[in-house]
Amino acid sequence: MSKLSFRARALDAAKPLPIYRGKDMPDLNDCVSINRAVPQMPTGMEKEEESEHHLQRAISAQQVFREKKESMVIPVPEAESNVNYYNRLYKGEFKQPKQFIHIQPFNLDNEQPDYDMDSEDETLLNRLNRKMEIKPLQFEIMIDRLEKASSNQLVTLQEAKLLLNEDDYLIKAVYDYWVRKRKNCRGPSLIPQIKQEKRDGSTNNDPYVAFRRRTEKMQTRKNRKNDEASYEKMLKLRREFSRAITILEMIKRREKTKRELLHLTLEVVEKRYHLGDYGGEILNEVKVNRSEKELYASPATLHNGNHHKVQECKTKHPHHLSLKEEASDVVRQKKKYPKKPKAEAGIAPQQPTPETLPVINKSDIKQYDFQSSDEDEFPQVLSPASEAEEENDPDGSCAFRRRAGCQYYAPRLDQANNHMCENSELADLDKLRYKHCLTTLTVPRRCIGFARRRIGRGGRVIMDRISTEHDPVLKQIDPEMLNGFSSSSQTIDFSSNFSRTNASSKPCENRLSLSEILSNIRSCRLQCFQPRLLNVQDIDSEECTSRKPGQTVSSKRVSAASVALLNTSKNGISVTGGITEEQFQTHQQQLVQMQRQQLAQLHQKQQSQHSSQQTHPKAQGSSTSDCMSKTLDSASAHFAASAVVSAPVPSRSEGSKEQNTGHNNMNGVVQPSGPSKTLYSTNMALSSSPGISAVQLVRTVGHTTTNHLIPALCTSSPQTLPMNNSCLTNAVHLNNVSVVSPVNVHINTRTSAPSPTALKLATVAASMDRVPKVTPSSAISSIARENHEPERLGLNGLAETTVAMEVT
């Protein structure tokens, strides 16, 4: 070899090592010139530490002098030892433990607070322990929570009460001490904090930063793992741990309850021992004298081992349970779990007889009977219905399914249907109750087909409709055609003649025509339902008899069912139908138009009469009677009859009482006085327009052959009509007219002496041949009706003056 070289190689165990003898080894001076390519081994220090002054001096001195100099060493602070002080702090009683590293698995230690107590805190703690017991750890936790909840601004006392779950006195004392100590402290917090490096780089040259973050390096190689699977495993592990913790908490609570029960049992035994109750007589007396609680609809669940006895009574009604007084057994009986027979599908549960009713003994409900750990009962989970059963069920997906954890009671057939089954007539009525029949509505007037009426929540009437093949024909039926048919209780179940059809089904060949359906209704073979209309006179008579003297009736008491329709008869016009709000408004507008025309005609006649009085003063009476005496035609009579208010005729005793009061009013013309009263919104069309007086029509006066209407015109002020004392002496005569008004107005009236207009009206009526005379008794009777029923007035408001009205 031309040049001696040496390279460090890894040792090979299979290659034998060369052995050199001492005489064969070269001299050290010869080996110095050998170029050794030895890699520099890491020193274990950072570059800044390697360049330290003392370290470099020591290394260079060793290389130069080939030995270690005493002066060339790295300076190290001297370690001082004080043995006496150490022995005083740590006693020499040391025992070597069995193991130095002790790990408690599954031990979840609470997080220790960051705050540490000092001597000042110990002084406060000793003072607080005189009144209440508080541990140092509890005090540190309270101060730590207050410190972490407040940054630059301190928390208030109310916020501290929400943070600390302690006594109010303790919270107040600790809070005041903490606020005082925090203000005296110069630092930002009572908890000493280590200064750390900030991410913005402002603390790079700060020598007080104790810990600095490592420089983030790029990871050149990635270990590809299934992160999702590991995440799921961690979630599963967390759920298992939380479940284990929950089970342990429940076991802890159960054992604590059992311990309390044991202590109570021992106390009872000690009391019985001191009282000498060895046979249990005193204990039985205490149990008997205790008042039994009522059994409610939802029985309370007993937390003991006798759950199976309560489960047997779940399907029974609580009223069928009975308690049997028996002496409590000393020996605990073994529990029995009877198997319940499976009920066949489609069979309803039968109502239990009194012989088969379960009897709950008081001895079964033990006072100290609790469920231990080995008596876990699992609730019976009902198996879901199979697909075949769901397909066969007519309700499909909406079928009733029992829900776990709910108690279902059997229907009480003894109260629901027993009285129906005993009485055959009631049973027939109960069958008719669930039939669908042809139904018509009043508002709107139409036929809705076959329906069944039932009562819903709050007393609402609900109509359940059924689809039949006769619906296209039934829609053509006019409800007026069904008014003349009389209902009969002997009806045939027409529902069996038709079947339910879908929209896609073909029309049935056996569909009845409209004439056949009407003939079936007329012959009572088909049941037809129509809302019954109440008679106004019946309602008024009932209210008059039930009402006390002086008591008024509300204006809202007349419902829509009391409104009748107009039907013609031989004796005249009878009202049996209803009016809507639009018809009422139209009628009011027509009355206003008629009133304006009458006022214009009266004004013209007054001017003509005034001119004729100057020329022919003697012929004034005859001309006036000739020009103003007119009768109504049929159309005007119908129109005026629709606005007349009628009331039931009071008894003779009532009329005689009112006759003796001294009110002398003739022909039913009443002059009301006093302030007017605003009515409902339908009268605003008349009351809002100035110069137009409201219309008040006086009730009809009963007669043997004919009914007479004397309409009156009521004005809001005497200035509206300047003919208060004029010669309006004509009366209106209607033959064969009797009306019923659907409107009742609650109002008070006051009568006065008859006006000259009323006296002239009575004189002209007596002189006319076509108008029969109105007797004073009938007039007083009408006035008595006015006084007895002040709530019934016309369609519009009050007025202070009453004058006659002429209808043309």
From Swiss-Prot:
Main location class: nucleus
Keyword Oxidoreductase: no
Keyword vocabulary terms for this entry: Chromatin regulator, DNA damage, DNA repair, Isopeptide bond, Nucleus, Phosphoprotein, Transcription, Transcription regulation, Ubl conjugation
Bias (Polar residues) ranges: 615-630, 658-682
Cross-link (Glycyl lysine isopeptide (Lys-Gly) (interchain with G-Cter in SUMO2)), chain numbering: K135, K195, K324, K362
Subcellular localization(s) per the UniProt record: Nucleus
Compositionally biased spans, kind Low complexity: 595-614
Residues bearing PTM Phosphoserine: S755
Function: May play a role in transcription or DNA repair.
Protein name: Enhancer of polycomb homolog 2
Biological classification of the source: Eukaryota, Metazoa, Chordata, Craniata, Vertebrata
Gene symbol of the encoding locus: Epc2
